[in-house]
Amino acid sequence: MAKRSIYFCGSIRGGRNDAQFYAKIIQHLKQYGDILTEHVGHCGPEEEGLDDKTIHDRDLAWLLQSDVIVAEVTQPSLGVGYELGRAIAADKLVLCLFRPDSGRRLSGMIRGAINSVNFFVEDYHQDEYASKIDQFFTVRVTRP
């Protein structure tokens, strides 16, 4: 049986305050498939030696080949917004996770994209990330 491919989105250049938390989310997601973007959870220097075009083309190819996209959208990021727009255009199954207790407001372009078919946004507290992911994969994601 083929393993499911999961594309995880999280802020890189928009701010790395949540990088360690992204690593926890990624670790939890591994039970559901292969994570194509595990580097998003690394706390070291961002993708040394890769130019912007290479990063864009590689990440877009991964996004398009993925079965599911999970995005942590609390830290605003132009790149994550772009990835989500491309995911919607490609009719991908998407879960966005947002922490309202961060003091931020989620963009209307993200929350307004909820369609109850393949684009979902879950508000959560940081200690609830695993249960929100588990619920999504149990209810929304079909077996690979």
Swiss-Prot record:
Chief place of localization: cytoplasm
E.C. numbers: 3.2.2.-
Record keywords, A-Z: Cytoplasm, Glycosidase, Hydrolase, Nucleotide metabolism, Nucleus
Protein localization: Cytoplasm; Nucleus
Residues binding substrate, per UniProt: Y7, F8, C9, G10, S11, I12, R13, Y22, H39, E83, S107, G108, M109
Catalytic activity from the UniProt record: a pyrimidine 2'-deoxyribonucleoside 5'-phosphate + H2O = a pyrimidine nucleobase + 2-deoxy-D-ribose 5-phosphate; a purine 2'-deoxyribonucleoside 5'-phosphate + H2O = a purine nucleobase + 2-deoxy-D-ribose 5-phosphate
InterPro entries hit by this protein: 2'-dNMP_N-hydrolase (IPR051239), DNPH1 (IPR028607), Nucleoside_deoxyribTrfase (IPR007710)
GO molecular function list: 5-hydroxymethyl-dUMP N-hydrolase activity
Domain of life: Eukaryota
Single Gene Ontology BP annotation: positive regulation of cell growth
GO CC terms, sorted: cytoplasm; nucleus
Pfam family, one: Nuc_deoxyrib_tr
Assembly information from the UniProt record: Monomer and homodimer.
Functional description taken from the UniProt entry: Catalyzes the cleavage of the N-glycosidic bond of deoxyribonucleoside 5'-monophosphates to yield deoxyribose 5-phosphate and a purine or pyrimidine base.
Family as reported in the entry's similarity comment: Belongs to the 2'-deoxynucleoside 5'-phosphate N-hydrolase 1 family.
Protein name (database record): Putative 2'-deoxynucleoside 5'-phosphate N-hydrolase 1
Organism listed in the record: Trichoplax adhaerens
